[in-house]
Regions:
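Extended catalytic cores of very large enzyme megasubunits
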Residues: 1-356
Length: 356
């Protein structure tokens, strides 16, 4: 049993830890709890995944022979069952269960400065969360809150639209499971609303403290906490070498309007950097992404600029792309004498990459 979750008569390898058992039974076994179709054994779960992937390979002609396909399936099953490697959660959630499974855990989206594009961003994120994955996006194309609209008035600005996206993320459980949606929201350091972005979470944290002191339930699912905004995303400011150098020299920095040059503003670069650090000290957000360095290390520069990352930031790539993660457990390749089994590791890598 884990909290309110309980499933009887489950089957796990003796070598698996209690923690691994809890996680798999609660999050990765598919089928309605207490129904005959509910998975109850690791053998069922691993066979569902490895068998489906092997069948895809057979259908698409990946294997030279029937025997090769069978060998691949057996090796992948062995690797997964002995915890030598593991796929990202959407694979366990969806493969062999959904007709068209969402397998990638990490998505990077894009958005343009139109209402249609902004609404499309929210729709895409909702579908990504439903499939058990997370997404990142850079909102710097959206005009600032002081910029004009064609038909009069001023724009809402990206920080305002973040409220709606944050609410959707808080509502949609990732993959229909207990895992919450994961978001990364990025804004460039030269965006006119960058200070609102820097402080949006810190201001909400002040509200959280006031509600706590007033006696509200501020646990993660409590009524008080769920009323606090911007809590379902990691926020990061995208900084360039030029900005950091200007801050170091104590120079001014230009905030650039997206569509209206009249809205440009000069600010003290060092003060802006200090405010970013102050907000991060208060609430651990925003983080910093070093735009210049990231793009200098870009492995596919011809495909476009890197503007954002996935929520955990290990995946940095072009907009409208996705990544299917897997992890290998290096300790499983350590021999009794402390040496590393390079041949077994290389073979496991080949099998897992083919499966991916």
């Amino acid at each position: 049993a884990v909290g309110s979750f309980r499933q009887e008569d489950v089957e796990f390898p003796k070598a698996w830890s209690q923690n691994a058992t809890n996680i798999v039974a609660q999050k990765y076994f598919r089928g309605q709890l207490n129904s005959p179709t509910r998975e109850r054994s690791v053998k069922q779960m691993v066979s569902r995944v490895s068998g489906t992937i092997a069948d895809w390979g057979r259908e698409r002609g990946y294997f030279a022979s029937v025997e090769d396909g069978g060998a691949f399936e057996a090796e992948l099953t062995y690797i997964l069952l002995h915890q030598m490697a593991a796929f990202n959660s959407p694979v366990w959630f969806n493969v062999g269960f959904e007709e068209q499974p969402q397998c990638s855990a990490c998505f990077i989206l894009s958005v343009e400065d139109t209402m249609e594009s902004i609404l499309d961003w929210n729709t895409k994120e909702g579908k990504i969360f439903r499939g058990g994955s997370g997404s990142g996006i850079n909102l710097s194309n959206i005009r600032g809150s002081m910029e004009h609209l064609k038909k009069g008035g001023t724009a809402s600005g990206p920080v305002s639209f973040m409220r709606g996206a944050d609410s959707w993320a808080g509502t949609i459980k990732s993959g229909g499971k207990t895992r919450r949606a994961a978001k990364m929201v990025v804004l460039d350091i030269d965006h006119p609303d960058v200070l609102d972005f820097v402080w949006c979470k810190a201001r909400e944290e002040e509200k959280a403290l006031a509600l706590r002191d007033a006696g509200f339930d501020m646990s993660i699912d409590g009524d008080g906490f769920t009323s606090i905004q911007y809590q379902n995303a990691n926020n990061s400011v995208r900084v360039t070498d030029e900005f950091m150098e200007r801050a170091e020299r104590g120079e001014e920095w230009e905030l650039k309007a997206r569509v209206d040059d009249a809205a440009n503003e000069l600010v003290d670069a060092k003060d802006l950097l200090n405010q970013l650090a102050d907000a991060a000290w208060r609430c651990a957000d925003p983080g910093v992404q070093y735009h210049t360095t990231i793009n200098e290390w870009h492995t596919c520069p011809v495909s476009g600029r890197i503007n954002a990352s996935n929520p955990c930031s290990e995946y940095m790539h072009v907009d409208d792309s996705a990544c299917n993660l897997a992890s290998l457990n290096l300790m499983k390749f350590r021999r009794a004498d402390g040496s590393f089994d390079v041949d077994a590791f290389q073979h496991a890598v080949e099998v897992v990459i083919l499966a991916e």
